[in-house]
């Protein structure tokens, strides 16, 4: 995933890889000498607290510049080479919106998907760590589903629209939109968290969102 982000015409200014000192969900710990070294100044390793899947955002939150674009992505996906360029273009046109290449609809608001890239203006992240500590940290289902609570925070607390860029995906030979990532990962994490059936898992996740 990191290589796919670096191997493109428009590179990110910085890539933060956030690795907790100790995980809440696992017994294993990762020592500094076990972390791969990157021969590129763009990539920076941050050791931090375990915030669940939201570690990818909260782990380096204090290092993010104001009025800039942060893109959340999954480290087990290989992304298309136009992802950063597309996000940057739409951000430049309307920076007060958030964007994802897939937005899951849920009543009044949509849920941006980190797996499909989730682009956010850092100006709207003020207060998100307090929200995590007060609302998310001790609620297992929310702790494990960062896309949901981050989207909730942006929409209801920051009045941020979360817009889908699905119609701007490239199409395959059959004329269907191709995902923004090349490597498809089965959503087993969602199933493990909420149930054996993916449909049931999504329904339970949505029920959590509206409680």
Model-derived segments and their meaning:
Residues 19, 100, 166:
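Short beta-strand/turn micro-motifs composed of small residues
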Residues 81-105:
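Conserved donor-nucleotide/metal-binding helix-loop-beta segment in metal-dependent transferases, i.e.
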Residues 1, 127, 136-211:
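C-terminal catalytic/acceptor-binding lobe
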Residues 111-132:
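Conserved nucleotide-sugar donor-binding
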Residues 67-78:
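Short beta-strand-to-loop acidic/aromatic patch adjacent to the donor-nucleotide binding site
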Residues 16-68:
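Active-site-proximal specificity loops/subdomain of glycosyltransferases
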